[in-house]
């Protein structure tokens, strides 16, 4: 009798619409219960039985129940699942398989089976890619996943690399394909094979994409020719190789090895500016005045060169600093090194006075054994030879930015707008509390930004600099010329790494159109989106592999008295993140390790400080001594403890 009763249906509808609901993200805990986080201020308790319907990170709508002053959430509807495609470790064998996602907060095994057509007999410990197929909030009885790709076996020494590349859906090897002959581009190539061009790189570098030649001119001027490898002489726009490079967008540099954007035959051989080999190049000739200004007679042209020497950063630096036993093989090469050092000095001073110079941070290099084991991690400071190449490349990129802007009005530009205008007042207020007075309007201009950066660089510590970082906007890739506040430049367009950056290949094609006096087509905005996304994924992959290798490297230091100097990089409610100075590893110090009585301590992300009993004891950028308390291999996290 109640079956089709409209009154009952209406009552049900009414009850449903009157029941309080909330949308938010599920946060799991290690104790079985969880929370529905609605926003930064509001969260609801999810009891353990209800947590079985959801997964950490799911965005859901839940019914809110109130009992005896206590509110709890009952998951009702899935808005967006946290897991769709993921990597994990297989448990069980044959017919009864499950997979544990490789995520610090997902501990439960999800029942699964191999997808049809996947010819692999999965066993305990295998790594796999899986896709979620069932979810309790979608009307299914339980969670269920399908294994879509076998990654590798559990004991493979190279798990960090293969799992990370699979997680981010990135290529594992160089692209296929060969370039048989150079294209006829209708370019006249200037023969510069007699000039003493040199390359300066790491000893192990095979993909040399820049060579330099310097010459003294009258009136204390210097000429610099930057010659860049010319892959677009081999790769036609729209060809199979070009499309593959467009998707990859960059060479992916991971600790221990790289996955090139172009076939190795091109990147490490045909295009690489090897010593004593004739190579086609795209070149830029510029004149530097006595104070390092780039004069207006910038000239881009096609050429052939023959590098006369493959020089190595450390050897060149040693020689210029009068240490070590290496010396250039001839006086002609020695003269090149001296002139290039002079150019570096001038350009460095010019940028210091008229633009901005980054503080030197060391590069950290993993030294790996045959089986991927970490033998050592060394900090490689940026020395004079690194700066010679850096200054030459920055100068060449400034030239390209100007020429493309003035001749075409577009290109692939690196743009950074400094501070987000919405943050200008908050920024000025924060600086004022530290005794620095800035105008909220002026700081949004290039000159105002540079002025502030110079004041910050003159501070005794980097603390204030770290506080204002959150107000900055991100660097972007744009087809429209625009300023790069971070470098303090009106425009910046890279073209000096076409073997490893697709955007530089595009700029090569545009510069060639300028050289030939032809019209060029503006690159589509989609390409900048693809490049930005690939850059993000490559960086995440590099970080993930690094975390894994750091955990391996420091595992035997856990629980020992070995001390490490560590810089505080971030402070949150839960504790502090630090970077070990000697090797670059990131470790976490939980708040209870800082002070036993929680109520006497305030950890403030906003202020970048830890106060104990009202006294500031730690602040971001402080360097402290720590020991390694624990290394958790399953989450690749390093827990440190301050030395008392």
Curated annotation (Swiss-Prot):
One GO process term, biological-process aspect: mRNA catabolic process
Domain S1 motif: 561-643
The organism of origin for this protein: Escherichia coli O9:H4 (strain HS)
Protein name: Exoribonuclease 2
Gene encoding the protein: rnb
Keywords: Cytoplasm, Exonuclease, Hydrolase, Nuclease, RNA-binding
GO molecular function annotations of the record: exoribonuclease II activity; RNA binding
UniProt record similarity statement: Belongs to the RNR ribonuclease family. RNase II subfamily.
EC number: 3.1.13.1
Subcellular location: Cytoplasm
